[in-house]
């Protein structure tokens, strides 16, 4: 439901999808909340490609910005979702910068920071690049290669202790046709990995299990 792919959008805005449907969906789930209205001290990291630096959204720096807009900036996979302007910034995916943009004392009280790295084992079928207009196929190849490289990127030794690898199996970040069963399995894999590894990384005995929807109700 978030695809809305269009070559016109790619040519005009730098991405196959505007991401507007996703932004409205998040905004609806959050009841239109801004950062200052959040109960938690939430931080969202995006990347300003014009300056090559991270941009951090939170209740101190951007109190009146909607959380949905910041999340929309942060999830902008290049070429898949359009660049979006924010003041003088040109915003894209927050994860394309180095890891040190994420590993910082966000709570300012020494609370440990845990980063989750998604790593897939998927093998893509060969894409044919013949025909009169092979641009779509070439873009698909570029996006897939980019996402595969990101998922297998080397983890700095300094951040290994605070990084948890979640094996997504054959699920890909650019697979927009996953079934409900695949989505549930992906969620369950992340949940089980976190429950198993976080106590080890943080030297705690165990975590209290969280409640989540049963498989039959997954969306």
Predicted regions and their residues:
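Patatin-like phospholipase
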Residues: 1-219
């Amino acid at each position: 439901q978030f695809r809305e792919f269009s070559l016109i959008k790619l040519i005009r805005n730098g991405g196959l999808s505007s991401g507007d449907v996703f932004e409205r969906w998040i905004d609806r789930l959050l009841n239109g909340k801004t950062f200052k209205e959040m109960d938690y001290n939430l931080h969202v990291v995006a990347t300003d490609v014009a300056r090559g630096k991270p941009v951090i959204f939170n209740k101190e720096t951007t109190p009146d910005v909607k959380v949905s807009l910041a999340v929309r900036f942060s999830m902008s996979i290049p070429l898949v979702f359009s660049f979006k302007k924010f003041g003088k910034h040109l915003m894209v995916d927050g994860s394309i910068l180095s890891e040190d943009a994420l590993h910082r004392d966000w709570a300012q009280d020494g609370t440990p920071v845990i980063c989750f790295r998604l790593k897939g084992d998927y093998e893509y079928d060969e894409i044919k690049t013949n025909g009169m207009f092979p641009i779509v196929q070439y873009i698909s190849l570029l996006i897939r290669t980019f996402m595969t490289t990101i998922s297998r990127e080397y983890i700095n030794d300094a951040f290994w202790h605070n990084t948890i690898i979640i094996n997504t199996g054959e699920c890909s970040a650019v697979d927009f046709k996953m079934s409900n069963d695949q989505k549930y399995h992906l969620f369950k894999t992340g949940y089980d990995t976190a429950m198993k590894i976080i106590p080890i990384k943080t030297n705690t005995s165990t975590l209290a299990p969280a409640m989540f929807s049963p498989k039959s109700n997954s969306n």
